[in-house]
Amino acid sequence: RLSPSEERKSGYYDWLVKRHMAKLNARYIGRLHSSGFYLWANKKADKLSDLKGLKMRTGSLYDRFMRALGMVPVTMNSPEVHTALERGVVDGFGWPNMGPRQRGWIKKAKYVIDLPFFGASNVVALMNLDKWNGLSKASQDKIIAITEKYEPGMVAHFKSGAAAEWKKLDAAGVVRYTFSDAVNKQYLDMAYDLEWKNLAKKVPGDVDTLRRITGN
């Protein structure tokens, strides 16, 4: 839930650098994109239980959350979604706010739960570690400095773009909605708690550190 600048201050950025070196032989440089994710469907849910049984185009990002909500995740490539919505193969999808209008998906799935989750996009800049180590210290420092300077403007750019896109979505008839404060919290807590449980299985020794440096 941290901004890229906050990640650098908290120690999470340094953790990512070490992790990518150890696991991928890559130098983590920084984030290139910032966006929340949403669940879109062909009907409005008055309560969380109304989401049960909905067939949703998914990706690894959404799978656990959708299953916990009682949805039925359906894996398919994004070019197939439009036809799948028209034929009733899926009732909705998980996606940021940028894209569904352009792809025509909102014609069949115009209801979106306006509670963004996982705001830190996984679109990041990496460099092969051997290539990175072949650069001069001055070049390395310059790359990091440029990226660090770029990130706040990048976040502002995507926030502005998202706000502009919501205006177009509203005009196109998209219905944004939430639940009660208590249910909104339950919804978002579920999304994050599931990922923490998954991390506890994958990297049990790192979870306490990750919670501390991410403020979660």
Whereabouts are the PLM-identified features?
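N-terminal secretory/targeting leader peptides
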Residues: 1-3, 14-216
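Active-site-proximal, glycine-rich beta->alpha crossover segments in alpha/beta enzymes
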Residues: 7
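Aromatic- and glycine-rich peptidoglycan recognition patches
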Residues: 11
